[in-house]
Regions:
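Thiamine diphosphate
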Residues: 1-16, 27-34, 159-162, 166-349, ...
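Active-site cofactor/cluster-binding pocket
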Residues: 1-233
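Conserved thiamine diphosphate
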Residues: 55, 109-112, 116-122, 330-377, ...
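Short coil/turn connectors at secondary-structure junctions
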Residues: 15-17, 38-41, 56-59, 76-81, ...
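Anionic-ligand anchoring segments at beta-strand to alpha-helix junctions in alpha/beta enzyme folds, i.e.
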Residues: 1-61, 68, 233-268, 465, ...
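Flexible, low-complexity linker and terminal segments
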Residues: 208, 215-225, 233, 363, ...
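Short, solvent-exposed amphipathic alpha-helical segments in soluble enzyme
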Residues: 7-11, 77-79, 98-102, 253-259, ...
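Flexible loop/turn segments at secondary-structure boundaries
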Residues: 28-31, 70-71, 90-91, 246-250, ...
Length: 601
């Protein structure tokens, strides 16, 4: 089902529509077939204008079995189209999900426009000339459904046929069987009387600035951003990682790009992965480790070591439902406080969070900039919704990318009282407080590293209380001094020049649902302001002033209010927290109601 959704998404992107997707699948490799927990779904929202979310209520549902129908029916609005694979609506599959009678016959679907289609039978019939077994032929029924949907929405088909022939190049008969099933689905829509209406969704020409676009997922955009950061820094990119859902795609993608100086190491565990990455940073590479929440917990000691060593290191956390193993394939934003404080001692780390799948590219570059300029580990907090979701991305010109080149230490930087010139590994840049980056093997720059406290300047081991106090405060000051842009606020004023009294402040992947909800509220005649944080540590310098402008501040989060807690503590603002931890992103309609109630309260 994920492949089917991905192909329809690619068709839609190539046609020029704006879009947003929500893949949703169980954690098991082979989930129990026909059960509610085993349902794999793919939701796509596309239009001829800009799109912000995968949509609250799908207008078309393709239910391949009773479980798929029951799991998704509550989200489908009255009057929507439901295409049902009638071959699967037999007694046993229906009983498995609690249907005592067939929903196709008991009147429970009267509010919908139901299209009963024997997808399995039609697929087997279309492939009878290939000599496949029934089981082999049945596997192509998703392609039949894809062909039918492609006909309904006048999607281009050449890309899908080319994809299928490439994917099954070593099994040409399977490739042609899938192409045939795909074409059969299209032809069925063209010839059957049950589908009297098809839809034309024009390209979203006004939604996109001029440029070259491609469809991209968050993890792919993040991978490309890391590669670009390595090239812009003129450094080898090193990834030390251990596979974990939903971050593993980054390891898979980066392993394909050795031609760009990328080296990947699949370690035996999370600790080895970050340890190797930190070693690569010491050796002069742009070092990255990728993980999710449980892996962050295991990496915490080495992150603290990176803080002490003051070396550039990117920790990419693709957040998922927790605690512990939790919900590996579902989304959440509950690692914010872990990223802020999840280490022993005072160990501050800058935090950057992308807001959309495409924005993951820019966020990776920004995280790399901070790490390289300030010689510090940096957290990049994405989540499962961004990682697996996709949208159109304008491919940037290389000239648009920031220059991330750094200067390695090359010789002595301190003169002692007797006139001797020596190298001090902790002699800091006066502006950034970053220490010099000395690559091992550079003559005369040998120095100690390790987790024990260092003496300011010399880098020698030090147990001196005053020195420890100074080093702790200096490391904090370095992070506090990271240069981040001021927070921009979208606050349309009325005719008298008066702004809104209510501000909605979000971070990370809540951007799409919040923005869609704010637009709904404004269309209803209400005034409301919106701002979105990319930098969570340090906060933008004007954040306190922005918060003080408004009577009410609403903070929607997919956790139990972690950002709101930070805002209350730092700015003494009465932030109203609106939370959800269902493993799914917010719906714009629900947020719009929350915002209206807050405005009118």
């Amino acid at each position: 089902m994920q492949l089917t959704g991905d192909r329809f998404t690619s068709e839609t992107a190539s046609f020029g529509n704006d879009l947003s997707t929500l893949p949703n699948f169980p954690a098991e490799i082979r989930a129990p077939a026909g059960t509610l927990p085993g349902v794999s779904s793919f939701q796509l929202h596309f239009a001829d204008h800009d799109i912000l979310t995968p949509g609250d209520a799908p207008n078309v549902l393709v239910a391949m079995n009773p479980a798929a129908l029951k799991a998704n029916l509550a989200d489908v609005p009255r009057g929507a189209e439901i295409i049902v694979n009638t071959d699967e609506f037999t007694k046993r599959p229906m009983a498995k999900v609690g249907y005592a009678t067939s929903p196709l016959e008991d009147g429970s679907l009267e509010a919908y426009n139901v299209h009963p289609v024997p997808l399995t039978t039609l697929t087997i019939e279309a492939l009878k000339e290939f000599g496949l077994s029934r089981k082999e032929a049945e596997r192509s029924k998703n392609m039949f459904a894809l062909g039918l949907l492609s006909w309904m929405y006048h999607r281009p088909t050449e890309g899908t046929e080319k994809f299928l022939r490439a994917k099954f190049a070593k099994k040409p008969e399977i490739a042609e069987a899938n192409v045939t099933a795909f074409r059969a689905g299209w032809n069925f829509g063209e010839t059957t009387e049950d589908f009297a209406v098809s839809y034309e969704v024009a390209p979203a020409t006004k939604a996109f600035p001029t440029g070259t676009y491609r469809n991209i997922s968050g993890n792919l955009a993040l991978s490309y951003g890391l590669v670009a950061a390595g090239r812009q820094a003129d450094l080898p990119l090193y990834l030390g990682s251990y596979p974990i859902t939903p971050a593993s795609d980054i390891l898979h993608e980066l392993s394909k790009h050795k031609n760009f100086g990328v080296r990947t190491f699949q370690a035996e565990d999370e600790i080895a992965g970050i340890g190797a990455a930190l070693g690569a940073a010491f050796g002069g590479a742009l070092a990255v480790t990728t993980t999710s929440g449980p892996g962050v917990a295991l990496k915490s000691e080495t992150i603290g070591l990176a803080v002490s060593l003051e070396l550039p290191l990117l920790i990419v956390d693709i957040q998922r439902g927790g605690p512990s193993t939790g919900l590996p394939t579902k989304t959440e934003q509950a690692d914010l406080l872990q990223a802020m404080y999840g280490r022993n001692g005072e160990a501050p780390v800058p935090i950057v969070a992308p807001k959309t799948p495409a924005d993951c590219f820019d966020a990776a570059l920004e995280a790399a900039r901070i790490a390289l300029v300030y010689r510090t580990p940096v957290f990049l907090l994405s989540d499962g919704y961004l990682a697996n979701g996709s949208e159109p991305w304008r491919i940037p010109d290389v000239d648009e990318l920031p220059d991330l080149r750094v200067q390695f230490a090359s010789g002595p930087n301190h003169q002692q009282a007797d006139g001797t010139e020596v190298f001090w590994p902790y002699k800091r840049d006066e502006q950034t407080l970053a220490r010099p980056w000395a690559v091992p093997g550079t003559p005369g720059l040998e120095h100690r590293i390790g987790g024990i406290e260092k003496q300011d300047g010399t880098g020698n081991i030090s147990y001196d209380p005053a020195n420890h106090d100074f080093m702790v405060r200096t490391r904090q000051a370095k992070v506090d001094g990271v240069d981040v842009p001021d927070l921009e606020v979208d606050d349309p004023t009325d005719d008298s020049g008066r702004g809104a009294g209510t501000l909605v402040l979000g971070w990370g992947s809540t951007y799409g649902p919040i923005t869609a909800a704010v637009r709904r509220v404004r269309r209803a005649g209400e005034r409301i302001a919106q701002a979105h944080l990319r930098h969570l540590n340090p906060f933008p310098g004007n954040l306190g002033e922005v918060l003080a402008r408004y009577d009410k501040v609403i903070v929607p989060e997919m956790n139990l209010g972690q950002l709101a807690t930070l805002l209350r503590a730092k700015y003494l603002v009465d932030a109203q927290s609106h939370t959800q931890v269902s493993g799914m992103p917010f719906k714009a309609e629900q947020l719009a109601e929350v915002f209206k109630e807050a405005i009118n309260d």
